Curated annotation (Swiss-Prot):
GO molecular function, one term: ATP hydrolysis activity
Record-given protein name: DNA repair and recombination protein RadA
Domain of life: Archaea
Keyword Endoplasmic reticulum: no
Keywords annotated in UniProt: ATP-binding, DNA damage, DNA recombination, DNA-binding, Nucleotide-binding
Gene designation per UniProt: radA
Disulfide bonds: none
Protein function: Involved in DNA repair and in homologous recombination. Binds and assemble on single-stranded DNA to form a nucleoprotein filament. Hydrolyzes ATP in a ssDNA-dependent manner and promotes DNA strand exchange between homologous DNA molecules.
Nucleotide-binding keyword on record: yes
GO BP field: DNA recombination; DNA repair
Residues binding ATP: G127, E128, F129, G130, S131, G132, K133, T134
Pfam families xrefs: HHH_5 (PF14520), Rad51 (PF08423)
Protein family (similarity comment): Belongs to the eukaryotic RecA-like protein family.
PROSITE patterns linked: RECA_2, RECA_3
Length: 333
């Protein structure tokens, strides 16, 4: 390695270390934020400079009551974290090398995904009822707890359940098969049932404080679309639904990036009655989810306990598919 390359790598590493330290600085340390304003921000889930840097002007203005001041505070936070200017593609590459991955526990699926489920990204799992979406989410909530040498991150998970499909008994089965203490595996999962789309969005906001206080590396929302579809039926409500869903997905993307966690969401499918050739099913949520998710994985049933996983949208993965089995021990090749 040349001396120039070593120097460049050292500079990038030093910059990243400095940014990480500054990111966790208390919000009240920012210029323009006093104790009263700081208390208001913390009440709404903005605890650190990192939280402010990833906020929108509109969100902050609603809290502090002044749009210009909100803009100034956000700019100050982004400047502190080095987010206010361009960086070299080399630095982007070096940052990408530090991305962490959670093994799915299925070797072929990990290979399809380039090593597993990425942090700082939203991975969407699409499929019909019974295709294995929730099973995969359960397995990931266990896999993240394994040490890095076994494909995990030695971390905890947050699980937001919108359809009452979370089963602790299944977690215990998968954990036991992976050599983990089943009770401890359950203890390492923060669970919440979401009863409406509003409640679902509030839980994502509350997840920030849990991530800050605990070693959390995975956030699951299963399913992301269910409440939005039931609460906003018909074409007359579509625009309102999509606007609200857009904010929810944007919040998830910001959370993934700001806290270096893997966000996994499941999505339902819907039929296209005017399609006579090819697959008549398409993911629910329209362009909002299509553009919001970083990676999109489609699961479908095959014979007996076999499922097919296809990656159909990714910034850099080629399209491809693999098969896996659902067993009592979990998902396996």
């Amino acid at each position: 390695m040349s001396s120039k390359k070593k120097k460049a790598d050292a500079e990038v590493s030093q910059t990243q270390a400095t940014v990480e330290v500054r990111a966790d600085v208390d919000v009240e340390e920012l210029e323009g934020i006093g104790r009263v304003t700081g208390a208001k921000l913390k009440e709404r889930g903005y605890y650190t400079v990192r939280d402010i840097a990833f906020a929108s002007v509109k969100e902050l203005a609603e809290i502090i009551g002044n749009e210009d001041r909100a803009q100034q505070i956000i700019e100050a936070a982004r400047k502190m974290l080095g987010l206010h200017s361009f960086i070299s593609a080399l630095e982007v590459y070096e940052r990408r090398k530090k991305i962490r991955r959670i093994s799915t526990g299925v070797r072929s699926l990990d290979e399809l995904l380039g090593g597993g489920i990425e942090t700082r990204a939203v991975t969407e799992i699409v499929g019909e009822f019974g295709s294995g979406k929730t099973q995969l989410c359960h397995q990931l909530a266990v896999m993240v707890q394994l040490p890095e040498e076994r494909g995990g991150l030695g971390a905890k998970a947050i699980y937001i359940d919108t359809e009452n499909t979370f089963r602790p008994e299944r977690i215990m089965q998968i954990a036991k098969a992976r050599g983990l203490d089943s009770d401890q595996a359950l203890h390492n999962i923060f669970y919440a049932r979401a009863y409406s789309s509003d409640h679902q969005m509030i839980l994502v906001e509350q997840a920030k404080s849990i991530i800050k206080q605990h070693n959390v590396a995975l956030l699951v929302v299963d399913s992301v679309i269910a409440h939005f579809r039931s609460e906003f039926p018909g074409r007359e409500n579509l625009a309102e639904r999509q606007q609200k869903l857009n904010k929810h997905v944007a919040d998830l993307l910001r959370l993934a990036d700001a806290y270096d966690v893997a966000v996994v969401i499941t999505n339902q499918v819907m039929a296209q009655p005017d399609v006579f050739f090819g697959n008549p099913l398409r993911p629910a949520g329209g362009n909002i989810l299509a553009h919001g998710a970083t990676y999109r994985l489609w699961l479908r049933k095959s014979k007996e306990n076999i499922r097919i996983a296809k990656i159909f949208d990714s910034p850099y993965h080629p399209e491809g598919e693999v098969s896996f089995r659902i067993t009592e021990e979990g998902l396996v090749d």
